[in-house]
Every structure is written in structure tokens, then in C-alpha cells.
């Protein structure tokens, strides 16, 4: 298929659609067909075709079988090309396969619109015209101007800017799910779109914007009054900060926090953004961002685990959480501490920082009868493994030979394990030995 030739045909799609509409109106078609034509004219950003239909009393508020109004269609991304095929085969079947392939790679939220377009054009066109009409057009800069003009026409006809489709999405949801929808979002907000409205799944426009990873779009919504603690999903109770952290987007997470997002907010299972960041080895900067902005390192989710439980496989994460006061002796609902919950104890570097922390905490108590239950469990675990016992003895010797003021981050690494392990930068809030 000659992709260049097909793209060249695309330039005529506006005039073809306009002629179809003129002929269709003359034939007095059903309301359903006129409604499809309006959606298609809007999807292709054909302002003259839209005006022609509305001037002939086509209802701009009419919805399709998916609950989509013409305003929803407008705020969805314009058609764009996804596939290039090298071999040209001049028959309609191949053309249709090309469209199907492109549909499969399109966003499902609006792919059905193109299916209806295909059916409609096959009713009105000759076979040799199908390829011209079905070719998916590229987005041109002028289209953005047409989008605003079309929206103004629709709004002047009284269309409800907050009308929901069959899954509760408004036009603003769709516009925020579209990386190039900045002008559309601004115009919707200017005309009264509800910024914090949720769809049937508890997703807000801000959550859609966060998912697109477009910080400019997120900033527009926050500056316009979007709730930084708004919902991403009502089924599991996640908020937009969970989504930003889960996708590893530092800049958006920072923007949300600076706008008032709560770093300790939990989902239905009590999982906080800090729990989420602690799991992902690539989210160290996010972990530090959350801790710097008041995230509680000892907050528990419904199963009793803290972020330290999720971070125990990673030395740097454990070190960072200890710096901010994470408690190694907390016990979860299964009776485990973060240390006893480990599957193995083969990582000597990780063992060194954990056991030193445990030994420092033990030093705070003059009598075993006052040991916290979690500390007892951790000490029992150490005693049951020879390599852990050897590490504990070295830590005890280090602590015994040092004064309280000397047990600080940069002074212990060269002495523990004969400089074998790099503990530079480590410090503990529990190092205040009396």
C-alpha cells in the first residue's frame, strides 16, 4: 500500500464529507444518520460541515449508543495515523484492513466513532471512493483553532458542558486524556466545566491529566481549582498522588504536593504514596520527595505493613527510611517485622545497616524486660543465623568502643567490617545513646 498516496487522498476528506452532508440533507435522512454525520464532521474538525448540519436543525445534544454527545467527540483526539504499509494493493478489502489495523492501535474511547464512519461511508460512496474517505487524516496546527470555533458553536446551541457519557466521562475528561488538549481544556474551564467531577469509576479530569504525564495540563487544572487530593479510582480508593508516584513521575508528584496533596493519604487498603514509592527500585527520588514533605515512614496499611516492609530488598531505600525514623521493630498483622519478613539474609551489605540499627536500639534499654516485642523478634532472628550473629558482634564492638557523639553516619563505615561495606551518608534517629 502506498502510504504517501493514501495520505494525499486525505486532503480531500473535508470536501468529500461536506458533499456527503449536502446530498444527505437533500434526501431527508433519519435523525440517526444526521447524528452520525455531525459526530464525523466534528471528529474531523470540519467546521463548515458542522455549521451546515446545525443550520439544518441537527440536534447538537443528541447522544449516540455510547452516551456520547458531539461535545465529547470534539474533545477526543483528532484522527491520526499510526501505521505505514509499504505494499500498495488497489482493492477495497486491503483499504479496510488498513483502517482496522489503525483502529486497533487507536484509543478505545473513540475507536467506535471510526467504525460508524466506515459503515456510513460504505452506504453513501462507491467502492473506489472508500479509500479516500476512510484514510485517517493528520492533525494540522489550524485544527486547534477549529476546535475552539466548533466548541463555541456547540455551546451557543445550549449543549451541557458537563454532560456525562455512559461511563460518566465529561468532555473535560476526554480533553485531559489528550496530551495536545491544552487549548481545549482551557476553553472548557473558561466556559464552566466542572474540574472535580468524577466519572463512574471515580476518575477525575485531574487523574486523566496525571495519566498523560503532561505537567502543563496538570498545572492548568490545579491553578483553576482542581483538588490535589482528588480520586483516581473509587474501586480501590487511590488518589492522583498515588497515580503520579506509581507512574514514577517526579515533577507531577512535586506539583501535586506543592498544591496541597496529602503524602499520607491512603487508599481503601491504607496504602499511601510512600508505600507505592518504596516498592519501585527506580523511585528513590520520589521516596525522598515524600519523606521531605511529611510522609510518615511508620504509617501502616490494612495488613499492618509500613513502607519499610516494601523497601527491605534495597539498601539505599532502607538507609533513607532509617534517616527519617523508620522503625525496624514494627510488627505486621502476620507477626513479622520488616527484618523477619525477609526471604533470605544473604545480602551482607543490607544486613549490616539493619543489624547496626537493631543493636543501637537495643542499647537504649537497660533491662530486657522492657524490650519491645518487635525488637525481641529481630534479636531471635539474628541469633538463629550464624552470619547475622557475626555481624551483630561486630556492631556491638563498634558501639561499645564509641561514645554517643561518635556514632554518626560518616564515621562508622571505615570501621565496620574492615571497610568492606560502604555506609557513607547513613544516620539514624535512634543513635542518641545515653
Swiss-Prot record:
The lineage of its organism: Viruses, Varidnaviria, Bamfordvirae, Nucleocytoviricota, Pokkesviricetes. This is Putative ankyrin repeat protein FPV023. The keyword Aminoacyl-tRNA synthetase does not apply. Pfam families: Ank, Ank_2. InterPro entries: Ankyrin_rpt, Ankyrin_rpt-contain_sf. Gene3D superfamilies: Ankyrin repeat-containing domain. It comes from the Viruses. SUPFAM superfamilies: Ankyrin repeat. The keyword Repeat applies. It comes from Fowlpox virus (strain NVSL) (FPV). ANK repeats lie at residues 33-62, 134-163, 167-197, 201-230, 236-265, 269-299, 303-330. Keywords: ANK repeat, Repeat.
Amino acid at each position: 500500500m502506498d502510504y504517501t498516496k493514501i495520505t494525499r487522498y486525505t486532503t480531500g476528506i473535508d470536501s468529500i464529507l461536506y458533499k456527503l452532508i449536502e446530498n444527505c440533507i437533500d434526501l431527508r435522512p433519519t435523525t440517526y444518520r444526521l447524528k452520525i454525520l455531525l459526530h464525523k464532521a466534528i471528529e474531523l474538525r470540519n467546521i463548515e460541515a458542522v455549521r451546515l448540519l446545525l443550520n439544518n436543525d441537527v440536534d447538537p445534544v443528541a447522544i449516540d449508543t455510547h452516551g456520547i454527545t458531539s461535545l465529547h467527540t470534539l474533545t477526543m483526539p483528532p484522527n491520526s495515523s499510526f501505521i505505514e504499509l509499504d505494499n500498495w494493493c488497489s482493492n477495497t478489502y486491503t483499504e479496510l484492513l488498513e483502517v482496522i489495523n489503525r483502529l486497533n492501535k487507536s484509543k478505545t474511547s473513540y475507536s467506535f466513532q471510526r467504525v460508524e464512519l466506515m459503515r456510513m461511508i460504505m452506504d453513501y460512496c462507491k467502492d473506489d471512493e472508500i479509500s479516500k474517505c476512510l484514510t485517517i487524516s493528520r492533525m494540522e496546527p489550524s485544527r486547534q483553532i477549529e476546535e475552539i470555533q466548533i466548541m463555541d458553536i456547540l455551546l451557543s446551541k445550549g449543549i451541557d458542558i458537563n454532560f456525562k457519557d455512559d461511563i460518566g466521562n465529561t468532555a473535560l475528561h476526554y480533553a485531559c486524556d489528550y496530551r495536545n488538549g491544552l487549548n481545549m481544556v482551557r476553553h472548557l474551564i473558561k466556559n464552566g466545566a466542572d474540574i472535580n467531577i468524577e466519572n463512574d469509576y471515580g476518575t477525575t479530569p485531574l487523574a486523566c491529566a496525571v495519566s498523560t504525564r503532561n505537567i502543563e495540563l496538570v498545572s492548568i487544572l490545579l491553578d483553576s481549582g482542581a483538588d490535589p487530593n482528588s480520586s483516581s479510582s473509587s474501586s480501590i480508593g487511590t488518589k492522583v498522588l498515588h497515580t503520579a508516584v506509581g507512574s514514577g513521575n517526579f515533577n507531577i508528584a512535586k506539583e501535586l504536593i506543592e498544591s496541597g496533596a496529602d503524602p499520607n493519604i491512603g487508599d481503601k487498603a491504607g496504602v499511601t504514596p510512600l508505600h507505592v514509592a518504596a516498592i519501585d527500585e527506580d523511585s528513590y527520588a520520589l521516596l525522598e520527595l515524600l519523606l521531605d514533605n511529611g510522609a510518615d515512614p511508620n504509617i501502616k496499611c490494612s495488613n499492618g505493613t509500613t513502607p519499610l516492609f516494601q523497601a527491605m530488598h534495597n539498601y539505599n531505600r532502607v538507609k533513607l527510611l532509617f534517616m527519617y525514623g523508620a522503625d525496624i521493630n514494627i510488627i505486621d498483622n502476620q507477626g513479622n517485622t520488616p527484618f523477619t519478613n525477609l526471604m533470605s539474609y544473604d545480602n551482607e551489605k543490607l544486613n549490616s545497616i539493619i543489624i547496626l540499627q537493631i543493636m543501637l536500639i537495643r542499647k537504649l534499654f537497660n533491662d530486657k524486660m522492657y524490650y519491645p516485642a518487635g525488637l525481641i523478634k529481630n534479636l531471635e532472628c539474628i541469633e538463629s543465623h550464624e552470619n547475622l550473629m557475626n555481624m551483630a558482634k561486630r556492631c556491638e564492638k563498634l558501639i561499645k568502643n564509641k561514645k554517643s557523639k561518635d556514632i554518626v553516619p560518616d564515621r562508622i563505615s571505615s570501621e565496620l567490617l574492615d571497610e568492606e561495606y560502604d555506609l557513607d551518608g547513613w544516620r539514624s534517629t535512634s543513635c542518641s545513646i545515653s
